[in-house]
Amino acid sequence: MKSRKLARKVTSKYHELNAKLKTSLTKEEKVAIKDEIKALGGIDKYQQASVISTQFFNTSKFIIKTLRQFINNNSVRTKTNVPNVLEVGAINTVLKKYTSFKVRAIDIHSQHTLIEELDFFDLPPERDYDAVVCSMVVNCVAEPERRGEMICRLVEQIHEGGIIFLVLPSRCIQSEYLGMDLFDSFLRGLGCIELQPKRITPHLIFYFLGKSSTTASSSSSSSASHGSSTVSSWPDSICATIHSLMDTQTLERLTPPQAESTASTTSASANYTKKFRLYLPKAFVEYRTHET
């Protein structure tokens, strides 16, 4: 696949079919839609199309230019004279050509000798990178729950004063159950701050995220107390943080109608934790098609 027009057609159709699967359908109708997704090429073809859709925008050049601006105005503080950058899901070696940066490029299925073949989920929370680049990768993770987890792990890779360049399809965020405000609240709950306003295009959303000092210190404390169990403890700590940031009206939006019945004796905090674990991460795959 080399055509940008065809790539957008594939991604749009994939989104549309997945949205239909979320509606009330008969068993036969769901089987038919799954067969159509398979005929389209499934998640593999969608991933290829997502990459092609963004190749025409020089993401690497834009990121390097923006990172230099952040460093020059002290919005990003580097630990050394040569900024330490992690590129997650690298599809080329363009970033590595900038010798003024030390770039570690990884991908689960490396297509180049200079790109390290590594599953990002196997990477320990190093908290030592000046910058992490994750462009059109979260939306390609197959399991819905892991998409939410991936963003949590991205935050754990930068030190206080670092930056995350996160690029997602607009339709991942502007969906029926998620929305920009709710996703922004989710990021704040992870301790993220926007170093500059997000850049929104018709198809993509660019986030420029830093880590607050409170999050950095609490992460270090958690590591010292729990050691290797830190990663598995993220969901509970994230739930507690976000719960303190969101009002009741926002919390109600987290649960789809069919999942609202809970025991009256369940505490609000525990109930929210359950909602977050089971639902919010899945919001990243709610590719809803809004008909006019």
Please tell me what each predicted stretch does.
Residues 1-80:
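Class I SAM-dependent methyltransferase Rossmann-like catalytic core
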